[in-house]
Amino acid sequence: MFEDTTGMDSVHCSFCGKSQDEVKKIVAGPGVYICNECVDLCKQIIDQELAEDEAKKAFRVPTPGEIVNELDDYVIGQGDAKKTLAVAVYNHYKRVNAMMSGDNNDTELQKSNIAVIGPTGSGKTYLAQSLARILNVPFAIADATTLTEAGYVGEDVENIILKLLQAADFDVERAEKGIIYIDEIDKIAKKSENVSITRDVSGEGVQQALLKILEGTIANVPPQGGRKHPQQEFIQVDTKNILFIVGGAFDGIETIVKERLGDKTIGFGTDSREAEEVTDKNILQHVIPEDLLKFGLIPEFIGRLPVMTALEKLDEDDLVRILTEPKNALVKQYQELIRLDGSQLTFTDGALRAMAQLAIKRNTGARGLRSIIEDVMRDVMFDLPSRKDVEKVIIDKRCVTQHTEPRYVLKDEKAS
């Protein structure tokens, strides 16, 4: 039984040593005292540990349908790729949960790392980011072109894991269930299929270096990065439950696909149904592992990527939808920024299509839309905060193509 110490002679907290004059309250027990500050601290520690335990237990994996529904809120089009990614991610984390709970029925479930092929600006990185956000797991992006095999100047492959650790605030257990997206993976392809004549060390060597972490290994990760601190203690991270998604544009692989399909690409041959479906827009969806091998990825590397999907090139209609439809669409973001200045913002259909056409002309895809709309909006966002008489700003096609002034609808005009 605990009792109040008010009125007692001076006593001290048995935990922190503070006297009752230094704290608001001290509670006495049989031969022990505890102050209000230590009670609060104990409660915080217990609450935090309970929350962490619950989070570990409650790692519910959304169904593929739920994942696609979430992706639809942020990513326009690419229906086939969304389904493929949703199923692969669901199976991966179902496997992780089974391994953690021991419910694997003595059957070894292998990793389902993913290769995503798609033109620049088609949404490869954004899809991977969105998956990590939906699953609430740490996420890191690496650029394959910066990686080198051991012994050469550049980044070690272990630095990829370091980025994931940093995203997880160095919580190793969380990092071991994260997602890593490796971009520009096509840039580490061998320069020639005949390695005895041309051995591309920076390409094939990096592929070889990535094999172990893709499959699952205990990686020794330098917390300070790289080779500049050889005396640092390494952090051990098990990569067997980390989902790796690799992406690249694979420029020129269309030619390899067309050569393999031969006459079928123009509608001849026995499999006419498949032939009629092959177009310049969807040809990447017909890429098979043999095409990647011919492109320059080594067989062992391709074997670590059992799931493969392709993104279609975005056309004008796709880019207009990307500008306007997602929850975080660029148009909605800029409308909110202008609303915070007390005005409204409208883009005409001509303006939206002009921005989409400009992104296509620059071959930047969706990723180029931000810089285009920022350029269009720069003067508006500079002038508007100093004006209180503007009811609405209208951006039309000429604002995009000729950099003309937008139309300002003044509050007095609306009233009249």
Curated annotation (Swiss-Prot):
One of its GO terms (biological process) is proteolysis involved in protein catabolic process. GO terms for cellular component: HslUV protease complex. Residues 1-54 form the ClpX-type ZB domain. Zn(2+) binds at residues 13, 16, 35, 38. CDD domains: RecA-like_ClpX. Transmembrane segments: none annotated. ATP binds at residues 119-126. One of its GO terms (molecular function) is protein dimerization activity. It holds the Pfam family zf-C4_ClpX. Keywords: ATP-binding, Chaperone, Metal-binding, Nucleotide-binding, Zinc. Component of the ClpX-ClpP complex. Forms a hexameric ring that, in the presence of ATP, binds to fourteen ClpP subunits assembled into a disk-like structure with a central cavity, resembling the structure of eukaryotic proteasomes. Belongs to the ClpX chaperone family. ATP-dependent specificity component of the Clp protease. It directs the protease to specific substrates. Can perform chaperone functions in the absence of ClpP. This is ATP-dependent Clp protease ATP-binding subunit ClpX. The lineage of its organism: Bacteria, Bacillati, Bacillota, Bacilli, Lactobacillales. The gene is clpX.
